[in-house]
Structures are given as structure tokens and as C-alpha cells.
């Protein structure tokens, strides 16, 4: 029977891994159990069979077979499999475990608290492990440091280094703690396929196929303002979505006053002490989407068609969006792919954009919608490669502060421009954009992001300095050396 065998196998391997059981004595039993788990319990389609029904004791007169399945049996199998990896790799730390020293050096005049990258394969080889989270990272005070393994084979570490200084981290075999997620996101199918993501600074969202199918014209990135470092998206969406049904009942019962009061209490369009959505996107770039250009017109691919989440915290969130084909000039099936990456501790997302089926070079832009409430509150800096804007939010009279938005172009720009709209759309009167040349087959890389005056960005001058400093730091990354 699978669940019992798996639990015993896990326990015996755990005992060997932690030096409580003699491997020579228990290895034959462990191998017998594991052989059953992989040759009999594991089915060709990946399911786990031969699991007794929940709540029942073993009964030799009753038979289980490959179709006898239950979630707890699968969980027990996976528990044993994880311990099996540590058993084979010997990855539980002991005094004889090899260690790796990692020096992180800051040659700049800025205090740095960056997410840095190493090749995960190199770490696995040096520790003699097959892969996975089978090691622990410590700082100089023997405090565990959170890390993340990415979809593209990187090991991410967060390093805090003073100006013109260095710090040393130590990597050893062992079982890491479960880290608190700060950079994460998901698709909210219950809210018309929103892709929403956040870190300890702010949150954003992109609109999906359900919005496009409904006929709503919302193209750009939206902003979730936060004034707490902990994840808030689940709270935002749960509070907003669960209130809809209750409001409906109150409205139909003629209890409009109670309905309005409930809305004010639960909606994420009001600040209840941890943040709010008070940004209008509409048929614009919103807070930083890209678009190919035809003359002074932007060619939007509208909402994403498909999305794949690549990395899910705790230090980095990344996702790849693909869009429906659009016509650009004579090219009828131009498909945009957009990869966004957000690390812990930063206000800015990395955005890598590529266009398939484009036959000739085009101008490409990324920028920010300028709203009529603050039509002149933008800054364009071609030399340092960014545009920025202070947005008064949906209801300026509510005095909920300002949203500071920016697009940063570390690879340089052809121009920075204010492009007025032919007519006002959703309160927007124009865009402030950075424009580059795009060659077929290239990747257009820029950064977009935002901050809130009710959290950690007091004014536009500080926001500009933040963006400029980030640009400097991109050009001078922390130096990482293995010892």
C-alpha cells in the first residue's frame, strides 16, 4: 500500500540523512520500499496508485490497484521522493560538508541591497548535489539568507553591501527554511484573467483575454498602490470580488444605502490602510506598456492572449505574455512577446519585448499616460534615458497622494517625446514616451514602475533620483565571485 510504504521510506531515509540510523543496516529496506514506489505505485501517466481509502485500516482481504488513488497518497509519495534526493546526494549538512564562499563587492558610492545572480549548476557541482533546494546560504553572522532558483538556471541571492565595500556569504549543504514571499503574482481568472504581481514596494497588473472578449478597451499596465511591505494582492482581490454578490443582493432588495456602505468598506478602490487601486488605464499605455509606432500613432496589441508564469518568488517574479497578431504597416501578423521580471526591493520591473513577423525596422516606444488632472507633471530626460510622471490618481479631490511613474531605458533612446492624443480617453490627454529603433529579431529592453507618496516616495524629486540611481546601478552591478 502506497501511503504507508511512502511514510516509512521517508522516515527511514530521514533517519539516515540525519545520522540517527545506520545506512548499512537500513539501506536494503529503503531500496525495497523505493523500488515499489517507483515501479508499482507510480503510473505511466504520472498518477500514484495502490492507495488505501482514507480513514481505513489495512485489510488483507481487500485489494487496492493502480486506480486506487487519493491526494494524501500522492503527497506521501512526494514526501519520500524529496527525502530520496537528499539521501542520494547526502545533502544534509554535517561538519564534513563542503562549503562555498561567495564574495559580493560594491564598487559604487551607493548603498546597495540588490538581488544578484549565480549559475546554479556551478553551485550544485561544487556541493556534489543533483539540484534543487538542498543547500543553505548564510551571511557573516551565520544568519540564513533567502535564495531562489530560477527557470533559466540561476541562483538568486539578496546582498546588502555598503559603498566601496564587500560582504561574504557561505553556501553549505542543508535544508533551507521556508521563506516569506515578497515578489510573486498569479492570474486571477475570477477577475477577467488579470495577471497581477507585486513585491514589497508596489503591485501591477496586465489585462487578459476575458477583458478583450468583453469589448472593454483597457491596454496598459495598471498600478496597485501599496503602503505595506507584505503581499496584499490576495487581500485586494478577495475583498473586492467577494463583495460583488452581497452588493447584488442588497441592491435587488432595495437596500441601496447598505450596498453603498458595503462597497466603501470592501472595495480596493479605497485605501483601508494597506493600499488601493486608484489608477485609470483605459485605451492608453497606462503605467508603461510598449507599442510599435506608425508615424505618431501607437499600435497596441491590446490585452495579452496567453501567459506563462516563469518564476514565483520569493525574490523574483517573472512571466511571459504573448499577444494576438496585429497589423503594422504591410505586416499583417505581428506578434508581440513580453517578459516582465520583478525583483524584491525595487520599484521598477524589467520588460523584454520582441516582435515576430516584422519585416522591417520600426520605431518602438514605451511610456506613460498623461491625465488631464496633471497635464504638465511629466519629466523627459534623454541624457539619462528616462521619462517620469506624477499622477493625481482617479479622484484628486480625495487627497490620496500622488502616484509616481517612470520608464527607464538603460540601452539609450532615439528621442523622448510628449505625444498628445487626438481626443481625450479615460481622462488621458497624451503620453510621455521614450522612443527607440527596433530591428526585426531584436529584443527591446526597458524598465517601468511606480511608487506612492503615501508610502515611500515623498515627492517627484526623490522619485527622479531613485530612477536615476537605478539606472547607474544597472551599469555597475555588484561583482559576485566564488571562492
PLM regions: where:
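Beta-strand-rich recognition/accessory modules
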Residues: 154, 159-161, 406-483
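Solvent-exposed beta-strand/loop surfaces of large extracellular or lumenal domains
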Residues: 130-155, 327-329, 372-388, 409-422
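Solvent-exposed N-terminal domain segments of exported/luminal and surface proteins
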Residues: 175-295
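Acidic, contiguous internal or C-terminal segments within carbohydrate-active enzymes
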Residues: 305-364
